[in-house]
Amino acid sequence: MLLDLNVESPERSGTSSSSVLNSGDAGGGGGGGGGGGLFRFDLLASSPDDDECSGEQHQLPAASGIVTRQLLPPPPPAAPSPAPAWQPPRRAAEDAALAQRPVVAKKTRRGPRSRSSQYRGVTFYRRTGRWESHIWDCGKQVYLGGFDTAHAAARAYDRAAIKFRGLEADINFNLSDYEDDLKQMRNWTKEEFVHILRRQSTGFARGSSKFRGVTLHKCGRWEARMGQLLGKKYIYLGLFDTEVEAARAYDRAAIRFNGREAVTNFEPASYNVDALPDAGNEAIVDGDLDLDLRISQPNARDSKSDVATTGLQLTCDSPESSNITVHQPMGSSPQWTVHHQSTPLPPQHQRLYPSHCLGFLPNLQERPMDRRLELGPMPFPTQAWQMQAPSHLPLLHAAASSGFSAGAGAGVAAATRRQPPFPADHPFYFPPTA
């Protein structure tokens, strides 16, 4: 008996088959047929070319030997391609990931569609309950109007897009639907066409009227008024018998305040803009307000200001002398009349007192010409007064509010007695004009 272990294929490593060769009677001494018998037993698994299960007897010629062959040749092992020396392994992995990434479609320059509508340029507003249409032009959003349906708002957007951007514009519907509009919009500017679209919208009307700025008053007449302007909630324009009259009154006021860019109910060309009065001359604006920043100067020739014309009165009080009053009326020559015990002073000794003069307490007051008040003596210490003023005293600069220069002054005669040192904290004061 001969055992033969053969490996049939590389994929089935570890799988072997054993064959038992019985050649005991190969010389012709066995039972029946003179040919040698070959018996093969599979211990683990059978090869694909075995037709029957293990234990089946295969009759092979005696002269043939056992042949082991491989049906499918093994594929050669794939060697990994080496990465370039200048490229790191991580960079190669990133390039491979980018190559497998799907290509994203490029966005259009018109912007994304509206989230609240399936149409471009249409948005639904819950506060108003309308579909409003807008279009972007030169970085600004232009309002086209409010509509009851999204379809009508989309139509308005398409017309504006064709007018603003030409036939290559991105629109919601086909271009052939707007052939009639193309013929009409050639004669209009962008502003005029936007006004036409707004007038066609349902959001253009306010109140219970189809015209802008017109409402039905409770008295049965039509009221015209403008919205927020000059910090006011609204401006009342009046009551009219018909809607058209009220609408035209609103149009005139809108053109007056907003110029040629005003949104009107009718064509702005139907109004004579040059003949309309200015906004400052109308009763609806506070025209009496004078906002100029300036200081008003009184008129000296006015009868009211003549009563308040003031002069300068100088009163000097001392225990041993009577009141000394210096007064100059407005409009006369700058000569001061000084009364000292009913005796006028010589003009060569006319001087004004400084703030620290000895022996006198100056009291400059502004009084009207027709009312001359006599002031009582100022309180002084009870001690005896002895003073001797110098013959020449420095000039006193007049107050800025009195209107007199330093040269227009009057002097007081020098006293013959000496006074004790007088306190220096006695400034001039100017009480308000009566």
Swiss-Prot record:
Alphabetical UniProt keywords: DNA-binding, Nucleus, Repeat, Transcription, Transcription regulation
Taken from the UniProt entry, a GO cellular component term is: nucleus
Q: Known InterPro entries for this protein? A: AP2/ERF_dom, AP2/ERF_dom_sf, DNA-bd_dom_sf
Identify the DNA-binding region of this protein by residue numbers: 118-174, 210-267
| Protein's UniProt name | APETALA2-like protein 2
Skewed-composition ranges (Gly residues): 25-38
Q: Name one GO molecular function term.
A: DNA-binding transcription factor activity
Tell me which SMART domains the record gives.
AP2
Q: In chain numbering, where does the motif Nuclear localization signal fall?
A: 106-115
Q: Which Gene3D superfamilies match?
A: AP2/ERF domain (3.30.730.10)
Summarize the protein's role.
Probable transcription factor. Involved in spikelet transition. Together with SNB, controls synergistically inflorescence architecture and floral meristem establishment via the regulation of spatio-temporal expression of B- and E-function floral organ identity genes in the lodicules and of spikelet meristem genes. Prevents lemma and palea elongation as well as grain growth.
Please cite one Gene Ontology biological process associated with this protein: regulation of seed development
Please tell me whether the keyword Coiled coil is annotated for this protein.
no
Motif annotated as EAR, chain positions: 291-295
**Residue spans of biased composition, Low complexity class:** 12-23
Its quaternary organisation is: May form homodimer. Interacts with TPR2/ASP1.
Q: Where is this region: Disordered?
A: 1-116
| Organism phylogeny | Eukaryota, Viridiplantae, Streptophyta, Embryophyta, Tracheophyta
Q: Say where the protein is mainly found.
A: nucleus
Spans of biased composition, class Pro residues?
72-87
Question: Where does this protein have compositionally biased stretches of type Basic residues?
Answer: 104-113
UniProt record similarity statement: Belongs to the AP2/ERF transcription factor family. AP2 subfamily.
Q: Where in the cell is it found?
A: Nucleus
Q: Identify the PROSITE patterns for this entry.
A: AP2_ERF
